[in-house]
Amino acid sequence: MKVCIISILGRPNVGKSSLLNKIIKYDLAIVSNVPQTTRDQIMGVYTEDGYQFVFVDTPGIHKPLNLLGESLNKEAFSSLKDIDCVLFLSPVNEDIKSGDKLILERITNAKNKIAVISKIDLAKSPDEIAKKIDGLKEYGFNKIISVSNKNDKSVDSLIEILKEYAYNAPPFYDEDYITDKSMRFMAKEYIRESAINLLTDELPHSIAVEVQDFIEEDDRITINAIIYVKKDSQKGILIGKGASMIKKIGTNARMKMSHQFDTKVTLNLKVKVSNKWINDKSALKKFGYN
């Protein structure tokens, strides 16, 4: 077996989670158009044709405005320990920004690093892709490639390139192993994903989810969870008129869990206010953001 441990880095909302899901062919990392959707370091394992790649998806690196932001950056940079290759993602339609430069400084001495130009379906012309490639050349990447999550061939090309950095070693995990995250963790994330994709403005950044009970039975899983917000006004928005919004959130999350877990799911949601959770160390620890 040939193996390689790969860290996926980039600013918020550059396509890291979408790429991981496409590679491992499983909705592991939640996806939305809201920056900083990923809050945890998530490991996804690809095993095929005598190769095993362990991918580490990270929170988007940004200038932190609170303790949660500091925790997310710390989580992202911790992924650089004991890795064999770095994938640095940057969208084709965006210039290199201060957040990118922060990451590029941290990976200056990485032995193997690949620049991945993401969202190439948004490119207006081949010249735009060429300009992006030129802008990345000064940072010492081993390779610069472009990827579209809508194009399987471009993802296959990335896998072929990564094989160049794999080495002979016993596999880290069994062939059917996908992630180190538990079903309980995934339930929390699917609830948060459902809420994020239905809510607007700053509210998605203000929510946290706690799974209180995760009960596995022969024919179903029963989940009791709490969605926390920072303000009473946000609680009203999250619940909605006649509980319409919380019902939508619950229905969407339950349907995804039932599909991903391959069993019936009963989901019970409550909404509570925790005014300062985003800047409270004990609250962050409670929600899994150490």
Curated annotation (Swiss-Prot):
Positions that bind GTP: 10-17, 57-61, 118-121
Residue ranges of the region described as G5: 147-149
Region (G3) residue spans: 57-60
UniProt keyword annotation of rRNA-binding present: yes
Domain KH type-2, chain residue ranges per copy: 199-275
Record-annotated Era-type G domain positions: 2-168
Main location: cytoplasm
Keywords: Cell membrane, Cytoplasm, GTP-binding, Membrane, Nucleotide-binding, Ribosome biogenesis, RNA-binding, rRNA-binding
Pfam family name, one: MMR_HSR1
UniProt superkingdom: Bacteria
Family according to the record: Belongs to the TRAFAC class TrmE-Era-EngA-EngB-Septin-like GTPase superfamily. Era GTPase family.
HAMAP family attached to this UniProt entry: GTPase_Era
Protein name: GTPase Era
Organism: Mycoplasmopsis agalactiae (strain NCTC 10123 / CIP 59.7 / PG2)
Taxonomy of the source species: Bacteria, Bacillati, Mycoplasmatota, Mycoplasmoidales, Metamycoplasmataceae
The encoding gene: era
